[in-house]
Amino acid sequence: MKRHTRKIAIIGTGLVGSSCAYSIVNQGICEELLLIDINHERAVGEAMDLSHCINFTNTRTKVYAGSYEDCKDMDIVIITAGPAPKPGQSRLDTLGASAKIMESVVGGVMASGFDGIFLLASNPVDIITYQVWKLSGLPRNRVIGTGTSLDSSRLRTILSEMLHVDPRSIHGYSLGEHGDSQMVAWSHVTVGGKPILQILEEQKERFGEIDLDEIVEKTAKAGWEIYKRKGTTYYGIGNSLAYIASSIFNDDHRVIAVSAILDGEYGEYDICTGVPAIITRDGIREVVELNLTEDEESRFAKSNDILRDYMKTIGY
């Protein structure tokens, strides 16, 4: 992968793709931003609109619409294309339709000669990331999904409201499926460096009503609470994509909970799931293996088993 340029393509200029593009432009994350959509005129319109906001930023990003052929020189291709779940559906229910879209998208991108990093947000993101890895033939470190990055952010926000602490002082991760079966590694959640389990034990009078299982469920259902009120979510996931892309270009070595293809980590093989990973200019440098408790291991394995069952429906 080239190291001297900062070029991004976004495939899918719906609400998630356009929100991601807006974050990327405002933060000056890349030099060039290519927008691709099945509705080319929509991509053209988004590119025009974003170009017109450049003068109000401290950046100078070239934004334009194009096609898969233009992906050849891109460093990162972000895929947000895919159907939104309907009321009553889970993210997993969109798998069949999303998988068909990926076959066309990945084929077109790879035919251009693309040799960079795929960054996925299309749901169900863990399975779609695995599919894109298989279809592309790229090394597993260069196919990354947003995974539980947004869930981990939601977790920290929920805890911050309960504990009255800045969420940036809370560290911890949701693991497993970006969906209903995700779990939280509570044994590794800290507040100001202090284990949350210790805090809850020592301060029962203040925090005795906090129910950890309820927080896990609230975290997993947060997207649906937004969905019920405004129809879909896009700001959080758009910023998550921009954050990961920035970490790649800046070679930050930042630890982010992403969809990563596992090959022995956590005792799991041939599956893509949400885990903390070190993100660098080459993609995933290393999966961070947390020392989980027996109960956490069981919950994590159960989440992965659910993903495997759905993977079989598209031939994996």
From Swiss-Prot:
Keywords: Allosteric enzyme, Cytoplasm, NAD, Oxidoreductase. Its EC number is 1.1.1.27. It is found in: Cytoplasm. NAD(+) binds at residues 16, 37, 42, 68, 104, 121-123, 146. The keyword Transmembrane does not apply. Allosterically activated by fructose 1,6-bisphosphate (FBP). GO terms for molecular function: L-lactate dehydrogenase activity. It is an enzyme of class 1 (oxidoreductase). Pathway: Fermentation; pyruvate fermentation to lactate; (S)-lactate from pyruvate: step 1/1. The keyword Cell wall biogenesis/degradation does not apply. InterPro entries: L-lactate/malate_DH, L-lactate_DH, L-lactate_DH_AS, Lactate/malate_DH_C, Lactate/malate_DH_N, Lactate_DH/Glyco_Ohase_4_C, NAD(P)-bd_dom_sf. It catalyses: (S)-lactate + NAD(+) = pyruvate + NADH + H(+). Pfam families: Ldh_1_C, Ldh_1_N. Coiled coil: none annotated. GO terms for biological process: glycolytic process; lactate metabolic process; pyruvate metabolic process. Its main location: cytoplasm. Substrate binds at residues 91, 123-126, 151-154, 233. PANTHER family: L-2-HYDROXYCARBOXYLATE DEHYDROGENASE (NAD(P)(+)), L-LACTATE DEHYDROGENASE. Homotetramer. Belongs to the LDH/MDH superfamily. LDH family. This is L-lactate dehydrogenase 3.
